[in-house]
A protein has these predicted regions:
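Mid-domain Rossmann-like dinucleotide-binding core that forms the NAD(H)/NADP(H) cofactor-binding site
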Residues: 138-223, 227, 239
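C-terminal hydrophobic helical "lid"/dimerization subdomain
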Residues: 3, 235, 247, 251-255, ...
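Glycine-rich beta-strand-centered segment in the early N-terminal region that forms part
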Residues: 20-35, 48-96, 113, 133-140
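Rossmann-fold dehydrogenase core element
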Residues: 262, 274-314
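Short, well-ordered coil/turn residues at beta-beta hairpins
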Residues: 84, 241-243, 344
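Glycine-rich cofactor phosphate-binding loops and adjacent beta1-alpha1 units
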Residues: 164-168, 191, 203, 207-287, ...
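NAD(P)H dinucleotide-binding glycine-rich loop of Rossmann-like/cofactor-binding domains
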Residues: 89-175
């Protein structure tokens, strides 16, 4: 099968590898029909020390069940499914508490890896896979795009709002205008926020966020950005949703909150461990981590997409074939597309 690997910093390519095999009783082999490039993939893509042939970090997919392990009872060959980027077991303390993004049965992260390919092996599939009614041919391309967001970015945006306890009437600020930030805007609106300010410098992304439910955008950064947000909100925010993963983004998020505010962070951290002593005087609550993808999809996000209540698939502004994967990365890196979808026929 074809699989994407890094060839050098700033370049990816396809190689031929063996198809994955069932390795555990609760494994499933999927034939991928749609995958994509995530903003977090670009951290490795830009790494000057990346090794040629290093497996990429593509981790979002929807596909068809090809083969199942002997313990699988919830799906069968031919089923159409969302492959969450996390693989919760559904039975441990973390999963039962609704935090399957950090399942206790995994060492390190429980994320998918290398799914910019024709097939993938999905672990803990009996609980973690999310079945979609019907087949891909039953849906429009727009709907398939929205299903694909349910593998990561829509649940991740929702997770930021959930752990920040966004509730009806809240004033919310979203830091980050990529796909996760856009989905955080959707999530804040779903949870009843009265004002949603997106911090963004890019006109196309500003417009998308306004259409998703943002009530204002702020292009300024640093102290100027904080002052502008506070002017718009008439004070600090009740909740800030950090969707970037840099120290500057965290500082911005903390700066826009009023005393007693709440920070939800879902940007994968690319900074040294940050001391939280600075939040002491503000009584700031801080929470975040990998999203509870399976939990959110099964409880309400898949239904919201099927019912037409949300349309997060709009974040996929360009589509590519698997053979065009290098161009997809380049366009993401150069901000020519908000999120690149890969179509595999």
């Amino acid at each position: 099968m074809k699989k994407t690997v890094y060839t050098k910093a700033g370049q990816v390519g396809l190689v031929e590898v063996e198809r994955p095999q069932i390795e555990a009783p609760d494994d499933v082999i999927l034939r991928i029909v749609r995958t994509c490039v995530c903003g977090s993939d670009l951290w490795s893509y830009r790494n000057p020390e990346i090794e040629a042939g290093h497996q990429n970090s593509g981790h979002e997919a929807i596909g068809i069940v090809e083969e199942i392990g002997e313990a699988i009872t919830t799906v069968k060959p031919g089923d159409f499914v969302i492959a969450p980027f996390t693989h919760g077991c559904g039975e441990c303390d973390a999963c039962r508490a609704g935090y399957d993004g950090t399942c206790d049965r995994h060492i390190g992260t429980n994320w998918s890896d290398g799914v910019q390919a024709e097939y993938m092996r999905f672990e803990y599939a009996n609980w973690a896979l999310v079945k979609i009614p019907g087949q891909p041919s039953d849906y429009t391309e727009a709907m398939l795009k929205s299903f694909l967001t349910l593998a990561d970015v829509m649940p991740t945006g929702y997770h930021a709002a959930r752990v920040a306890h966004v509730k009806r009437g809240d004033k919310v600020v979203v830091i980050g205008d990529g796909a996760v930030g856009q989905c955080a805007v959707i999530a804040a609106k779903m949870r009843g926020a009265s004002q949603i300010v997106l911090m963004s410098r890019h006109e196309d992304r500003q417009q998308m966020a306004l259409e998703f439910g943002a009530t204002a955008v702020v292009a300024e950064r640093g102290e100027d950005g904080i002052a502008k947000v506070r002017e718009i909100l008439g004070g600090g925010a009740d909740a800030a949703l950090e969707c970037v993963g840099t120290a500057a983004a965290v500082d911005q998020a903390l700066g826009v909150l009023h005393n007693g505010g709440r920070l939800g962070f879902v940007g994968v951290p690319h900074y040294n461990n940050r001391a939280l002593g600075s939040t002491f005087a503000q009584n700031i609550s801080v929470a975040g981590g990998a999203a509870s993808v399976t939990t959110y999809d099964k409880q309400f996000l898949l239904k919201a997409v099927l019912d037409g209540d949300i349309n997060p698939g709009r974040v996929f502004t360009h589509s590519y074939s698997l053979d065009e994967i290098d161009q997809a990365y380049k366009d993401m890196n150069e901000r020519k597309t908000i999120k690149a979808m890969i179509v595999i026929e």
